[in-house]
Amino acid sequence: MAFNIGALFAPTAAVKIKEYAETVLGYSSNDAYHFSFAVACASLIVSMAIYYAFRSTFKHVEGGERKAGADIKEEELTPEETKARVVALCLVFAVVIFFWMAFHQNGLTLTYFADEISAKTSEGVQSMAFDVWNLVTIIIMVYAGFSCFQSKTAKAKLISGLLVLAGAAFLGWKYTQVSGSIDVSAPIYQQFNPFYVVALTPVSLAIFGSLAAKKKEPSAPRKIAYGMIVAAAGFAIMAFGSFGLLTPDAQKEAGDAAMFVSPNWLISTYLVLTFAELLLSPMGISFVSKVAPPKLKGMMMGGWFVATAVGNMLVRVGGFLWGYIPLWIVWSVFIVLCLLSAIFMFAMMKRLEKVA
């Protein structure tokens, strides 16, 4: 959660730093972005310094230390049980590869789309989505709304309700300040995924909490399979919005005849892909932690991140397809991969749920 709160502000900060380097320092667009990377590098160093400076304040929650005299009993598994669990985890890792390959197109083809195909300007209500402070206000309203219904005391309900009203008033005032159109740069789209993660987490918890109370909550493997289907739906939005568009190569050569589409296609896609991420990522890590044989838990958790790394490496497939192939075909490749992965998960479901 904290990671995504920071990620929400990062795109706006990067764009502002780049604009400062261009307008104030006089650097070209091709050179100005280096300043954003420089600030990111410095920020990482500062983050590490903060971590080590204040490490003593959270040392009590760090793992890896065993108290003197502590007798920790590990679950004993037969060789057959160990093999079944390892095989099940490897099957999940195989699916995870294709999810991250598709999901992390947000750093490649989806950004290409934002840069080359999406409209460069936005106006009206839509333009408000590109202001990070509007997104922060919506997040506050979501959490305040949940607090209003879940709080036990009248005072807490009142405070939560006032926060919702204050947020609505702020957004209304911001709308009155909208005039004309604003410029939209490709990097700013990266704020939508962390925004959706932070805003939708309480919604996700409420849904699955309600299902759990009714004893109808899907198992972790089923959630992963559903996540692959939802990811396919996200790219289906892109495929539908790309019908009839020029190929990226033709778009570059078209000049004034170039075709641009509404930013809403990307904004909607990021929403659906975030739902997929919420279904798959935390559930997958939880599944690995629960199913991994005790003596192999560290290795199996490493396997999850190896699968993530392989998926990130395969993101390049989108780059190979970008340029001369119709866009709807590019997105269809990821639709097919996600659907095949979901079918594979459902085919292996009994084996996966047996060890879960």
Residue ranges of predicted features:
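Structural signature of the two symmetry-related core transmembrane helices
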Residues: 199, 219-237
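Hydrophobic core of transmembrane alpha-helices in multi-pass small-molecule transporters
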Residues: 247-279
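Hydrophobic positions within alpha-helical transmembrane segments
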Residues: 189, 269, 300, 304, ...
